[in-house]
Amino acid sequence: MSNVIENLGKLDRKVTLAIPKAEVEKEKQDRLVRLSKTVKMSGFRPGKVPMKMVEKQYGQQVEFEVRFDKAARKFFDITKEQDVKVAGQPKFEIKTEGVGEDEVAFDATFEVYPEVKLGDLTGAEVTRTKTEITDAEIDKTIDILRKQRVHYHVRGEAGEHGDGGGDVTAQNGDRVTLDFVGKIEGVEFAGGKAEDFPFVLGEGRMLPEFEAATLGLKVGESKSFPLSFPADYHGKDVAGKTAEFTVTLKKIEWAHLPEVNDAFAKSLGIADGNVDKMRADIRENLEREVKRRTHAMLKDQVMEALLKVSELDVPKALIEQDQERLVEMARRDLEQRGMPNAKDMPIPAEMFAQQAERRVKLGLILAEIVKAHGLEAKADQIKAEIEDFAKSYEDPKEVMRWYYGDQQRLAEMEAYVLENNVVNFVCDKAKVTDKSVSFEELTAEGNAQQA
C-alpha cells in the first residue's frame, strides 16, 4: 500500500513510495538538458554535444539520481504530513513486486523517536558533594607554588640565601649530580650509564635502591650496590634482572624556596604585591575548581538517577550516528596528541556502543524534561555563566567578545546552561543528601572517576 506507514515493531516503520514514471522521465530530461550545456565530450564544443549522446552517456545515472531524489522528497512530505518523528536516516530499497507499469516504487524503512516515560523524580536519590576552602588549603597551594619556583644552590658555598647548612651529605630534597654505570653479569647495558646526571632525591624519579644508595654520600665519594629491576619495569631487556651499579657523586645542591612576600605575590600576577590579595585570589581559584568538580559529580549523579527512573526504547540509528561522532572525536584527539596518520587510523565503532547508547538515552530524556516542564536557558543565565568562566582569564572582556562573536560557541553555552537547569530541576524534586568532603578528598575522588 502506497503512502501508508506500517508498524514493524516498537520503533521500526516502513512506507511504500510510488512515483509516476512520467514524473521521473520529465525530471530526468530536464536535468539532461541542463547537463548538456556544460558537459564536455571529445570532438564537441561545450554545450554543443547532441542530446542523444548526452543521454546515452549519462541517462542511466541521472535517472537513478532522480528516482532516489523523488523518493526522498516524497518520504519527507509523507512523514511531515502524518507528523511522524523520524530518527536517523531512512533506508530506501527499490520495490519490484506489486508495482504498476506506469510507476516506480521504493520501500523506505526507518525508525521513529520513542515515547519517553519519565518516572517519579521524588523517588530518585542524589548525593551532593560540598567542599569549603580553608586557610590550610590555601597554605598547601602556596607551598605547591613555592616548590614550582624552587631554585638550587651548591651546598656549602656561601650565597645570599646561605650555604644550606653544615651537613654536606646528600639528603632528601637535594638535587644531586652524579656519574653512574650499571652492569649485568659484568656487561654494561643500554641506558645503564650516564655522566653528569641530575635528579632530586626523594621525588621517586629513580628506583628506591638507587636513591637509598645515593643518600648520605659526599661530593667525590663513590658507592657500588646491587639493584633489582622490577618484573614490570619499562625496559624489557633488564626487567626482572639484578644489576651492579657504581655511582660517583659530583655535586650537591640544596633547594631554596622563595619566601611568601610581595615579590612572590607579584610573581603570581598580583600587581601591588599584596599578600592578602594573593591569598584571596588563590581562594577564588580554588573555589572555582570546587564548583567545577562538585557540579560535574552532581551532574553524573543526576544523569544516573534519570536513567534509573525513565523508560524508553533507543533507536539504533541514533546510536550508530553517535558512535560515528565518537569515532571522529577519538581521531581528533589522537591527531591533537601528535599521533601520525590519525585521520586514517581504523577505530572500530563497536567500542563506543555502550557509551553511545547512554548518551542517546540521556539526550532523549533531557529533551523530554525540557519539553514537559518548559525549561529554557535564559539570556541572563548564559551571560552570568560566560562572565564566571571569563574571570579566570587575564582579559575577561575579550573572552566575553569571543563567546558573543560566534553563534556556535554561544549555542554550546546555551546547551550547557539548559543542562544545568535540568540538573537543578531534578535536585528540587529528588531526595538529595549533602556530603561534606575536604578539597584533597574531592580532587582524589574526581581523579579516580576520570581514570
Curated annotation (Swiss-Prot):
It catalyses: [protein]-peptidylproline (omega=180) = [protein]-peptidylproline (omega=0). GO terms for biological process: 'de novo' cotranslational protein folding; cell division; chaperone-mediated protein folding; protein transport; protein unfolding. The keyword Transcription does not apply. Consists of 3 domains; the N-terminus binds the ribosome, the middle domain has PPIase activity, while the C-terminus has intrinsic chaperone activity on its own. The lineage of its organism: Bacteria, Pseudomonadati, Pseudomonadota, Betaproteobacteria, Burkholderiales. One of its GO terms (molecular function) is peptidyl-prolyl cis-trans isomerase activity. The gene is tig. This is Trigger factor. Belongs to the FKBP-type PPIase family. Tig subfamily. PANTHER family: TRIGGER FACTOR CHAPERONE AND PEPTIDYL-PROLYL CIS/TRANS ISOMERASE (PTHR30560), TRIGGER FACTOR-LIKE PROTEIN TIG, CHLOROPLASTIC (PTHR30560:SF3). Its EC number is 5.2.1.8. It comes from the Bacteria. NCBIfam families: tig. It is found in: Cytoplasm. One of its GO terms (cellular component) is cytoplasm. Residues 173-258 form the PPIase FKBP-type domain. Involved in protein export. Acts as a chaperone by maintaining the newly synthesized protein in an open conformation. Functions as a peptidyl-prolyl cis-trans isomerase. Keywords: Cell cycle, Cell division, Chaperone, Cytoplasm, Isomerase, Rotamase. It holds the Pfam family FKBP_C. PROSITE patterns: FKBP_PPIASE.
